């Protein structure tokens, strides 16, 4: 265990393409050997995007999301941070971004080698916020991109995975990492982001042999085998109009 993790709670580890990675309960991914922190699908300014269309959500999602990244940055002191696409909710997000939040982003990008991976929501990250843009990042046996393509060693986002299991008296639904040991899909870290159940057919295309879910808990990541997972629609059920 690295010094950066020494003061954290019990850690969960996963292996991907032979590399040891740490899925964090906040939703980030830590690669100790490279001092690399990965976060995905921040969707900054999603609240203001909805407000502009008349759906008045509290305008605090960007601040809450940045606070998580800032906390992980302070705890782990990464050399590099990769924001794995859909960092901003839309192309006009920078026009709605309060200057106080812009300053916090610039503080992060100036303190680290910050890489904005291009997403489907934000192909052109704002240049004035610092960092550098890449479509794909390759580092050792791992490749980082926004949308999964099924390549061995791939770390991607985009699908916003969630796992559902039976709890004590009720079902529990949590954001999660999804992996088969060869490829990994990150959870969405954004405060207002929803999620797609890992039993959805979209994940079957990425993990044809099945997957393990690493569910985010309070201060801990829980490993869930495929047999314990529940779908959002009971098996055999059909939608009725």
Feature map (PLM): residue ranges:
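Extended recognition/assembly regions associated with phosphoester-bond processing machinery
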Residues: 1-241
């Amino acid at each position: 265990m690295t010094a950066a993790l020494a003061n954290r709670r019990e850690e969960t580890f996963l292996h991907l393409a032979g590399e040891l990675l740490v899925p964090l309960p906040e939703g980030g991914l830590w690669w100790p050997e490279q001092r690399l922190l990965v976060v995905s699908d921040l969707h900054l300014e999603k609240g203001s995007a909805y407000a502009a269309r008349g759906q008045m959500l509290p305008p605090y999602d960007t601040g809450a999301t940045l606070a998580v990244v800032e906390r992980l940055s302070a705890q782990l002191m990464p050399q590099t941070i990769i924001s794995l696409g859909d960092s901003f909710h839309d192309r006009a997000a920078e026009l709605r971004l309060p200057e106080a939040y812009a300053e916090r982003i610039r503080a992060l990008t100036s303190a680290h080698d910050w890489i904005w991976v291009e997403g489907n929501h934000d192909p052109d990250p704002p240049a004035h916020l610092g960092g550098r843009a890449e479509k794909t990042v390759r580092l050792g046996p791992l490749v980082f991109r926004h949308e999964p393509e099924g390549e061995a060693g791939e770390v991607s986002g985009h699908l916003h995975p969630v796992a559902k299991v039976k709890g004590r008296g009720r079902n529990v639904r949590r954001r999660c990492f999804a992996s088969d040991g060869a490829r990994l899909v990150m959870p969405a870290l954004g405060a207002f982001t929803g999620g797609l159940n890992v039993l959805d057919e979209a994940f079957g295309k990425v993990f044809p042999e099945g997957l393990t879910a690493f569910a985010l808990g309070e201060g801990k990541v829980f490993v869930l085998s495929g047999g314990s997972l529940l779908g959002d629609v009971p098996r055999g059920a059909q939608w009725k109009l």
